[in-house]
């Protein structure tokens, strides 16, 4: 008998979704099923794989519960929430600001490009920065095979046997990052550095003063970066930061895309834009929006606005509706304050206390250097540990005095670590918050009691960079890098996708930045849903 089309039973990898199978720039023609199969087969049976299975089962349960609640909504309920949604959409529309011009610049495969610049023999060959344990990034030649950042090197080698590995060199990347920032400063002295390899610039004034179009500034800036560094970058121009970020990815590498400051142009642009393209919507939120509400594009956020208002808190519903309208942050960051600063390191799992204390000392020194560079001192110190079984634990202490020296940070961090020993961990992180002079640092941000009480019952604040609104409403927070998880939550599952080894993505590894990789996605839920959603712990 002829065998029929494969099902999930004989092709289990088809239902296995990880960050490694999500396309990045340069991966448009990748055989996605092959990548899924390789990742599935090489991770099957590992602790990471078991963690993934728990995550999938958890989200499936939540999706099933939400579907039941959707089915129980009456026509009267929907009519009520539609009125709520319509009123809020009108209010959001009234806030639309088309007066600013934002440019997002993103270096092309930054770490890999820097290494190729240092060693021209790598040009045209598939290469990745990292090791057999974990990759930081991959060049565009390697991406054609499905190799990407955050992927274990041994999986990458399986996908691309010719792959060349180059060890990381952050001093080198920081040097070139500083060169790019000199160029950015010519166009906007108050630019927002999202990470080592990206930035947001308000080019409104420079366009007005020089009487030039935004595309000319984008072209000139990109040429300036190349002249200064020998590296290429891509740019996106739009009326707000959220859309500028999306636009910078359209013509990668070494290209640019300009979205006019026109309402109709914006609405047309977002009408067919996949929701996953939006900063703040990661894998889990995508699954929920698609699986429960049938929302695949930004435009459908408005079409399903009654359900959004019924099931999500006002801040989350506002974010989703804003996405449907193509709205985002347009204000200048000068008046905003940094709320936290952190450092973390990932390594092969170990219970060696001497090594753990050495890692802690290194983190304290890096954290202190960053704080003193910005003139910061803080009262709350948080320790984050990721165990060998991918469980994320956090412990925090609020001190009587403000601290900033590496000695003070290390002294209190050791006490927090000592309480957890003996333990085998693969990640250590330190975070300092509640800074001196920050009147609101101890208060919760109403937009940040966010996105999933699906995932955790604790209050989780958004990951803060030196400019805390880099990703606009970044409702999807990465538990791997978010040091602000409520210290009472000690059994959170890890929602990123690492194996053993270093996890180093194209982000500033020394400071707390808004990262776009998959993480815990916290969703504030309305009272309608909360009885059916419970936080979980191991």
Residue locations for each model-derived region?
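Residues that scaffold, gate, or flank divalent-cation-dependent active/transport sites
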Residues: 1-196, 200, 324, 505, ...
């Amino acid at each position: 008998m002829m065998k029929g089309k494969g099902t999930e039973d004989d092709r289990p990898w088809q239902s296995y979704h990880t960050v490694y199978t999500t396309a990045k720039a340069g991966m448009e023609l990748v055989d996605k099923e092959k990548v899924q199969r390789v990742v599935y087969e090489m991770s099957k049976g590992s602790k990471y794989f078991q963690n993934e299975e728990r995550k999938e089962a958890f989200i499936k349960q939540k999706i099933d519960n939400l579907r039941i609640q959707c089915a129980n909504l009456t026509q009267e309920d929907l009519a009520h929430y539609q009125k709520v949604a319509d009123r809020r959409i009108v209010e959001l529309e009234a806030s639309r600001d088309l007066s600013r011009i934002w440019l997002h610049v993103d270096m092309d495969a930054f770490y890999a490009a820097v290494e190729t610049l240092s060693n021209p023999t790598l040009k045209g060959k598939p290469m990745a920065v990292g090791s057999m344990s974990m990759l930081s990034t991959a060049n565009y030649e390697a991406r054609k095979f499905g190799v990407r950042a955050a992927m274990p090197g041994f999986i990458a080698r399986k996908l691309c046997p010719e792959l060349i590995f180059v060890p990381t060199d952050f001093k080198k990347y920081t040097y070139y990052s500083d060169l790019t920032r000199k160029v950015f400063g010519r166009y906007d002295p108050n630019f927002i550095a999202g990470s080592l390899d990206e930035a947001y610039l308000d080019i409104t004034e420079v366009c007005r003063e020089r009487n030039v179009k935004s595309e000319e500034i984008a072209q000139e800036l990109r040429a300036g970066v190349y002249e200064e560094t020998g590296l290429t970058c891509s740019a996106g121009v739009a009326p707000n930061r959220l859309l500028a970020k999306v636009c910078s990815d359209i013509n990668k590498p070494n290209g640019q895309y300009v979205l006019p400051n026109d309402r109709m142009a914006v609405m047309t642009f977002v009408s067919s834009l996949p929701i996953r393209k939006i900063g703040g919507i990661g894998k889990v939120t995508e699954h929920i929006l698609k699986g429960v509400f049938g929302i695949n594009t930004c435009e459908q956020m408005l079409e399903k606005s009654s359900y959004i208002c019924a099931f999500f808190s006002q801040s989350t519903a506002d974010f989703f509706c804003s996405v449907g309208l193509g709205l985002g942050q347009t204000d200048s960051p000068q008046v905003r304050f940094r709320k936290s600063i952190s450092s973390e390191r990932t390594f092969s799992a170990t219970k060696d206390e001497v090594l753990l204390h050495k890692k802690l000392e290194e983190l304290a020194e890096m954290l202190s250097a960053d704080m003193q560079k910005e003139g910061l001192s803080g009262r709350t110190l948080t320790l984050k540990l990721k165990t060998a079984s991918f469980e994320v634990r956090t412990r925090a202490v609020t001190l009587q005095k403000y601290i900033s020296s590496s000695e003070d940070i290390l002294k209190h961090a050791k006490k927090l670590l000592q309480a957890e020993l003996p333990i085998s961990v693969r990640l250590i992180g330190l975070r300092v918050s509640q800074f001196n002079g920050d009147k609101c640092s101890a208060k919760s941000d109403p937009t940040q009691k966010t996105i999933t009480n699906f995932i955790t019952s604790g209050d989780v604040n958004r990951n803060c960079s030196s400019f805390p609104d880099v990703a606009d409403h970044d409702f999807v927070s990465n538990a791997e890098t978010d040091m602000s998880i409520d210290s009472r939550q000690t059994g959170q599952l890890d929602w990123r996708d690492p194996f053993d080894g270093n996890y180093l993505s194209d982000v500033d590894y020394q400071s707390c930045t808004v990262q776009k990789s998959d993480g815990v996605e916290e969703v504030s839920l309305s009272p309608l849903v909360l009885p059916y959603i419970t936080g979980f712990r191991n």
